[in-house]
Amino acid sequence: MAAGSWKATRLLLAILVALVAFSYQVKRKTFIRIEEVSALESSVKETLEYVTDEYNKKSEDLYNFRILRILKIMKQVTGHLEYHITVEMQRTTCLKTETSLCDIQKGELHKKIQCYFSVYAIPWVEVFKILKKNCTDIS
């Protein structure tokens, strides 16, 4: 009998701790919503430009890459915006020192990658930061 009541007490204590921890997390990050959004949204365009520029700055490749296809964009609204972006990017004919719109690389230098970016964004004050980046070769 005592063992049964001890198990019940431990279970109630575990539930109480879980509820307190959950309420603390809710207060810490006010989660409002997450939704799929269009690339035509103005803040999304700015975020995609930022992601492309940052990728090219940090890449060790001699050539710039550009977004070829947008696979998915999710917007998470909390105290700020967070975009979760999945894109296909392809190597261009422009070296890193060139900034004009360039053709896609063909032949031996052809390279296509799929990238996932998680981006912290406050677009109305032009603040962006890549929180996570994962790119893999797809060709």
Curated annotation (Swiss-Prot):
Induction: Up-regulated by testicular factors. However, does not seem to be directly regulated by androgens or estrogen. Its main location: secreted. Expressed in epididymis, where it localizes to the proximal caput and also part of the midcaput. Not detected in other tissues tested. The keyword Signal applies. Gene3D superfamilies: 3.10.450.10. One of its GO terms (cellular component) is sperm head. The keyword Nuclease does not apply. Glycans are attached at residue 134. Disulfide bonds join 94-102, 115-135. One of its GO terms (biological process) is defense response to Gram-negative bacterium. Keywords: Disulfide bond, Glycoprotein, Protease inhibitor, Secreted, Signal, Thiol protease inhibitor. GO terms for molecular function: cysteine-type endopeptidase inhibitor activity. Residues 1-28 form the signal peptide. InterPro entries: CST11 (IPR042930), Cystatin_dom (IPR000010), Cystatin_sf (IPR046350). It is found in: Secreted. It comes from the Eukaryota. Has antibacterial activity against the Gram-negative bacteria E.coli. May play a role in sperm maturation and fertilization. Belongs to the cystatin family. This is Cystatin-11. It comes from Mus musculus (Mouse).
